């Protein structure tokens, strides 16, 4: 028996045929399916094709296949490889996961960024994310004093 297929259309005009059961991991898409708005495909105005490919890859991996369950350990290893991406791609995935309302992908991408920050000094964080320090030394000192609890 073949699964029902739906078409997802990226913001740059690419079309992707995906199993409905895989695509509805996105609450945004699930609501469109419920409202029967999928006949002509689902336009995803905020998601480029290179990011949609990654989202589909993630959803396919996380689609629950009762016949072939995946262990949590294997999923964690897969997640680690999946998130081995350029920063800009991770940020675009965060935006896509938020727009598509895929909580598990949103959590994974945000945790990846949190792990990039964990244990770093403000200077290291600025360097990692190319953030310009536009505080004067006096302003920076005032912020540090205000938030001393965070540095303990």
UniProtKB/Swiss-Prot annotation:
Biological processes per GO annotation: auxin-activated signaling pathway; jasmonic acid mediated signaling pathway; protein ubiquitination; response to auxin; response to jasmonic acid; ubiquitin-dependent protein catabolic process
Subcellular location: Nucleus
Gene3D superfamilies: Potassium Channel Kv1.1, Chain A
Region called Interaction with the F-box domain of F-box proteins, residue ranges: 94-152
Protein's pathway: Protein modification; protein ubiquitination
Stored CDD domains: BTB_POZ_SKP1
InterPro entries: SKP1, SKP1-like, SKP1-like_dim_sf, SKP1/BTB/POZ_sf, Skp1_comp_dimer, Skp1_comp_POZ
Pfam families in the record: Skp1, Skp1_POZ
Alphabetized SMART domains for the sequence: Skp1
Keywords, in A-Z order: Nucleus, Ubl conjugation pathway
One GO CC term on file: SCF ubiquitin ligase complex
Expression by tissue: Expressed in young seedlings, roots, leaves, floral stems, inflorescences, and siliques, with a slightly higher level in inflorescence than in other tissues.
Subunit record text: Part of a SCF (SKP1-cullin-F-box) protein ligase complex. Interacts with ADO3/FKF1, COI1/FBL2, EBF1/FBL6, PP2B10, At3g61590 and At5g49610.
Family under the similarity heading: Belongs to the SKP1 family.
Function summary: Involved in ubiquitination and subsequent proteasomal degradation of target proteins. Together with CUL1, RBX1 and a F-box protein, it forms a SCF E3 ubiquitin ligase complex. The functional specificity of this complex depends on the type of F-box protein. In the SCF complex, it serves as an adapter that links the F-box protein to CUL1. Plays a role during early flowers reproductive development.
Protein name (record): SKP1-like protein 12
Organism in which the protein naturally occurs: Arabidopsis thaliana (Mouse-ear cress)
Lineage, broadest ranks: Eukaryota, Viridiplantae, Streptophyta, Embryophyta, Tracheophyta
């Amino acid at each position: 028996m073949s699964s029902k297929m739906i078409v997802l259309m990226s913001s740059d005009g690419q079309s992707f045929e995906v199993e409905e059961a895989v695509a509805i991991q996105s609450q945004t898409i699930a609501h469109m399916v419920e409202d029967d708005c999928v006949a002509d495909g689902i336009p995803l105005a905020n998601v480029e094709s290179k990011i949609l490919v990654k989202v589909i890859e993630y959803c396919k991996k996380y689609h629950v296949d009762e016949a072939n369950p995946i262990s949590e350990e294997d999923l964690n290893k897969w997640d680690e490889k999946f998130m081995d991406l350029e920063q800009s791609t991770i940020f675009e995935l965060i935006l896509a996961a938020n727009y598509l309302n895929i909580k598990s992908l949103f959590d994974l991408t945000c945790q990846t960024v949190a792990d990039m920050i964990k244990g770093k000094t403000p200077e290291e964080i600025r360097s990692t994310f190319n953030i310009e320090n536009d505080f004067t030394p006096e302003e920076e000192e005032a912020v540090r004093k205000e938030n001393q609890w965070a540095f303990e």
